[in-house]
UniProtKB/Swiss-Prot annotation:
Enzyme class: transferase
Chain coiled-coil ranges: none
Species for this entry: Bacillus cereus (strain G9842)
Keywords, sorted A to Z: 4Fe-4S, Cytoplasm, Iron, Iron-sulfur, Metal-binding, Pyridine nucleotide biosynthesis, Transferase
Disulfide bonds: none
GO function terms (MF aspect): 4 iron, 4 sulfur cluster binding; metal ion binding; quinolinate synthetase A activity
Obligatory cofactor(s): [4Fe-4S] cluster
InterPro entries xref list: NadA, NadA_sf, Quinolinate_synth_A_type3
One Pfam short name: NadA
Reactions accelerated catalytically: iminosuccinate + dihydroxyacetone phosphate = quinolinate + phosphate + 2 H2O + H(+)
Record protein name field: Quinolinate synthase
Keyword Cytoplasm: yes
UniProt cofactor note: Binds 1 [4Fe-4S] cluster per subunit.
GO biological process, one term: 'de novo' NAD biosynthetic process from L-aspartate
Length: 368
């Protein structure tokens, strides 16, 4: 059975009439529907969403915050999730059976989540077990499919976010001697290193060659990193940092831990989306910042803090393209179909997958 037990009906083409509507008319209709539906409708929005979408969010946050609000909301019948596919899956798994989760555009995926599929993961686990026996525990970044979360759940593991990665990695080492971290090698490496694990005690599993890449003694490997990454944060480089240091020596550099180890090591600060937002918020007026994260968020931070000099670490950075698929026309389309009693782009995860994935999610949520 497919992980998505049903996605009824699957709609990917926005009706033509939404292309012809003015922004003002669309905004007016969204306001009308939100007012009409009241608590029956809940719209969570990720920080990386466009301003035209975030303005209508009932809750804006990073992956951890949105997982928490999804789990705590018991009033809404409809949850229209303005994020990407894995986030909507998580919302469906953490809400009740009578709550309906809708993703405005089914094309809003995540390339990182797609870098670890369940067949690859099961195969990797089998091969790694031959090497290390029953000494491993899996952790997966929430930026992963429901199937990968379920794999971690049934193998004693948990999910993590960039906000709680250190806490969850520390917990994992109270359970087993070794950690398998999926699917983002950079978050896993940066977190483990920050906790005092040297690089030569980390290895990388390549799912395309089914091979383990390492430099040190295999017996001393503590962390096995999945060879995946975020296509947005991969674009920040040490060269970007060198340019900022040269041209703006008094500028602080803050990056997301999905950036590679070399970039994080060369930066002044590194932390989750919430950490970055809070750091800029609390910084003194007149301070200068180069931020290494998604462009929609950077632009919003710039707008919110005119008293500070803020730039993107990479001046040629673009937004997360899949996150950007959720726009005002798609949001309105989803809301108007609900208003008519129709349901498009419903996310409904298979119940067995949900049961196992929720084990992993709850092991995280009960510790944060």
């Amino acid at each position: 059975m497919s992980i998505l037990e049903k996605v009824q009906p699957i709609e990917t083409m926005l009706p033509e009439r939404y292309h012809k509507m003015s922004k003002e008319d669309m905004e007016k209709r969204v306001h009308e529907i939100k007012e009409k539906m009241g608590k029956m409708l809940f719209i969570p929005g990720h920080h990386y969403q466009k301003d035209e979408v975030v303005q209508f969010s009932d809750a804006a946050g990073d992956s951890l915050q949105l997982a928490q609000v999804a789990a705590s909301n018991k009033d809404a019948k409809y949850i229209v999730f303005c994020g990407v596919h894995f986030m909507a899956e998580t919302a469906d798994m953490l809400t009740t059976d009578d709550q309906i989760v809708i993703l405005p555009d089914m094309r809003a995926g995540c390339s990182m989540a797609d870098m670890a599929d369940i067949e690859q993961t099961e195969r990797a686990w089998k091969e790694l077990t031959k090497l290390f026996g029953d000494t491993m525990i899996p952790l997966t970044y929430v930026n992963s499919t429901a199937a990968i979360k379920a794999f971690c759940g049934r193998n004693g593991g948990a999910t993590v976010t960039s906000s709680n990665a250190k806490q969850m990695v520390s917990w994992a080492f109270t359970q087993k001697e070794r950690l398998v971290f999926l699917p983002d090698q950079h978050l896993g490496r940066n977190t483990a290193y920050d906790l005092g694990i040297p690089l030569d005690k980390m290895a990388v599993w390549d799912p395309h060659t089914d091979s383990l890449e390492y430099d040190g003694d295999i017996e001393e490997i503590q962390v096995i990193l999945w060879k995946g990454h975020c296509s947005v944060h991969q674009n920040f480089t040490v060269k970007n940092i060198e340019n900022v240091r040269k041209n703006h020596p008094d500028m602080n550099i803050i990056v997301h831990p999905e950036c590679c180890y070399e970039v994080v090591a060369a930066s002044d600060y590194a932390g989750s989306t919430k950490y970055i937002i809070d750091m800029i918020e609390s910084a003194p007026s007149g301070s200068k910042w180069a931020i290494g994260t998604e462009m929609n968020l950077v632009n919003r931070i710039i707008q919110q803090h005119p008293d500070k000099e803020i730039v993107s670490l990479n001046p040629f950075m673009c937004p997360c393209l899949t996150m950007n698929r959720i726009d005002l026309p798609h949001l309105l389309w989803a809301l108007e179909t609900i208003e008519r009693g129709e349901e498009i782009n419903v996310i409904s995860v298979d119940k067995q997958v949900t049961a196992e994935a929720v084990l992993a999610l709850n092991r995280m949520l009960e510790r944060v």
